[in-house]
């Protein structure tokens, strides 16, 4: 599933990320990465990292509305359903 960012992310190399492809299937590694997060904020960032394939640094630079939207779109797939 593709998601168009509200605010594009500027990468260190000067390029921009404007669209993110959200995974619709997760692995045990993904569950572990999210489960090992320290709190609600960390777990939301971890979810967006595994769902998007972006680096944590890229996700930390995202607009909060985009982080929240991607997490909300990915969560149903993570728990076994569809959005």
Set out the residue ranges of the language-model regions.
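Short, surface-exposed, charged amphipathic helix/loop patches that serve as local interaction elements
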Residues: 1-83
